[in-house]
Amino acid sequence: MLTKEIQIAVEKGEMLPLMEEFYTIQGEGYHTGTAAYFIRIGGCDVGCHWCDVKESWNAALHPPTKTDVIVENATKYAKTIVVTGGEPLTWDMTVLTQRLKAENLQVHIETSGAYPVTGAWDWFCLSPKKNKLPVAEAYEIAHELKVIIYNKHDFIFAEEQAAKVNKNAILFLQSEWSKKEEMTPFIVDYVMNNPKWRVSLQTHKYLNIP
């Protein structure tokens, strides 16, 4: 049971339920192949059945950590920070992003966009989910739209989402990992016939890195 003081700190973004943090090579989307420090925040109620980090869903399993400590750890590694989850926008990201930027770090987010946008982001990767669609602002500010393809019906969803996102967003299709053998050929064919899209692969899993 969290104390009232800790609950207030979490609500303000002075503390966040930190699941894990690690330095690695980005494996997906526009920044594939570049070094980045990942901050994974616990808590998500979007509930994708194919989620590969279901252990992140219950925020209560991840101890509230002072934002200053998270930032101090991040400064030891790359100049690019990726905030992911879970669903990081479940929480107020204002304090975290302010303090990361004060250290002259580039701050990226990977989000479903299902919650109001807080924080200041240098790169906003929107990965929408059918269960809980993005808020309007997420479509407006997204630098990158990454749609996960689990079955052929997801191509329809991808086009629906592409129609909502701003015209400058870069569009990616990425197979759900357990379906990669089945769906990747369809994705390749789709991108060749619809070249506004790009293929995203989970290269970190091929490289066996976090």
From Swiss-Prot:
GO molecular function: 4 iron, 4 sulfur cluster binding; carbon-nitrogen lyase activity; magnesium ion binding; S-adenosyl-L-methionine binding
Organism: Flavobacterium psychrophilum (strain ATCC 49511 / DSM 21280 / CIP 103535 / JIP02/86)
Catalytic activity: 6-carboxy-5,6,7,8-tetrahydropterin + H(+) = 7-carboxy-7-deazaguanine + NH4(+)
Keywords, in A-Z order: 4Fe-4S, Iron, Iron-sulfur, Lyase, Magnesium, Metal-binding, Queuosine biosynthesis, S-adenosyl-L-methionine
Domain of life assignment: Bacteria
Subunit structure: Homodimer.
Family from the record: Belongs to the radical SAM superfamily. 7-carboxy-7-deazaguanine synthase family.
Record-given protein name: 7-carboxy-7-deazaguanine synthase
Amino-acid positions noted as binding substrate in the UniProt annotation, renumbered to this chain: I25, Q26, G27, R40, T84, P210
